[in-house]
Amino acid sequence: MSEKLDSYKLMQEHQTWTSKPASLEEWQIVNEWAIAEKWDLGLGDTERFFNIDEEGFYLGYVNDEPVASVSVVNYTDEYAYAGFYLVAPGARGKGYGLRLSYDAFRHCDKRSVGLDGMPEQEENYKKGGFVTHYETSRLVGIHNQQVDAPDGVQNITADNIDEVIKFDEKITGYPRAALLKDWFSGEGRHGFVINSGDGVIGVVGIRRSTDGYRLGPLYSENQAVCDKLFAMALAQVPQGTQVTIDAPTLDLGFINGLKKMGFEEIFHTFRMYRGKEPQGEKHKIQAIASLELG
């Protein structure tokens, strides 16, 4: 629907459309929508998201009532990430999400943009210039095994966070210091790192979420490192608790291992880019930090 047609429809219905960046407090309505959709949000994630680009979280309003959300967060002068594409249940099918996207995407200007899109939206994103690169599987399982903390794994602390951030940039292809500086610390949040003589060779984070725990990111240079970090993360989780993992299909061995443990894929997304894809070492990603911001 064009903006002119959409505006005409709103006028015919005596409705007024506005959109603007939301404050952290105003964004809480989006968290409520996401929880209702079973997104299993990481507790404390929102505050860390706003550390990156507090002007990148948009709400659309009809007659001053919030009806839609989109985030377009500028990580660097060259790269942005889009997420939180949501429309309030009673306002769907009216073009509000698409209209808000037009408004919000002005924020990223000429930057390349990444997103994890649901399959039903893939064609719409393609019309906007996005290209599909690979899939990400949302896997969920109940942690029922006794796991002992392995040797050779260190906590992520203020003393080594800079090394972790540099490793993350090597893997993802773009700097995320604003996101990661507090990602592994705080109530219910844990981060672990493995070093070799040449520096960091693996990182994992795990945090409380609305439905249990979310694990991510998980990056590793080899299978042995992956196994140790995964075990260390699970050692933080009480038995009988749900664990959620967003795993790119670039490492099918990791995904198949999860399924053997009883994890089930409940949906998948498409990682899409408009413009240049960041040039990292994505084949070393077992789990991303979040679908919402990459």
Curated annotation (Swiss-Prot):
The UniProt entry's GO biological process terms, in alphabetical order, are: response to antibiotic
Q: List each copy of the N-acetyltransferase domain by range.
A: 17-146
Coiled-coil residues = none
Please tell me whether the keyword Metal-binding is annotated for this protein: no
Question: Recorded GO terms, molecular function?
Answer: acyltransferase activity, transferring groups other than amino-acyl groups
**UniProt keyword terms in alphabetical order:** Acyltransferase, Antibiotic resistance, Plasmid, Transferase
Top-level taxon: Bacteria
| PROSITE patterns documented for this protein | GNAT
The name of this protein is: Holothin acyltransferase
Provide the species name.
Pseudoalteromonas sp. (strain SANK 73390)
Species classification: Bacteria, Pseudomonadati, Pseudomonadota, Gammaproteobacteria, Alteromonadales
